[in-house]
Amino acid sequence: MDKKQSLKTAAYEVFSKKGYKATGISEIARQAGVAVGSFYNYYESKEAIFLDIYIDENNRVRQAMIEELDWEIDMIDLIGQLFAQSRTLVSSNKILAEWYNPAIADELHSYYSSEEGKVANPFHQFLVKTFTNRMQAEGYSPEKIQDILQVYNLFY
């Protein structure tokens, strides 16, 4: 395993146990078996490695949601299930629950609301494609679909 992957693995373990605020770079480096100075060859800050960990964890959890939900049910019911499952999975996951932590929330929200974050987010792309296809199949006009997707983008 290379040093960057060792740092990510260690950071995942430490953040999962202690949370964002109580975790320090020195502890991550020690757990990874690398010098603190080496940490900065791969990440510029604790925020940067946490964002990397958060993105991976979010993608993993959201992929599980894609596989578990029935995407063919009524759209209103589907949206309700989507929100309920998201709440459950986020609140039970120490890393994803940091979304609400003022110490890191701005960084997370900024990334996910950016164009880069949306393009790089497979779950976002899946939802846009899935809901667009469903609305087309149900006879929504292209203008109505666009309006609905604009509202979706306000929330996502």
Which residue ranges define each predicted feature?
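N-terminal intrinsically disordered/low-complexity leader segments
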Residues: 1-2
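Amphipathic alpha-helical interface segments
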Residues: 10, 14, 85, 89, ...
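Short coil/turn segments at alpha/beta junctions that flank glycine-rich nucleotide-binding fingerprints
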Residues: 17-21, 93, 138
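Hydrophobic alpha-helical connector segments
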Residues: 52, 56, 66-92
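Amphipathic alpha-helical packing segments from all-alpha helical-bundle domains
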Residues: 62, 109-139, 146-150
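Amphipathic alpha-helical segments used for helix-helix packing
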Residues: 88-112
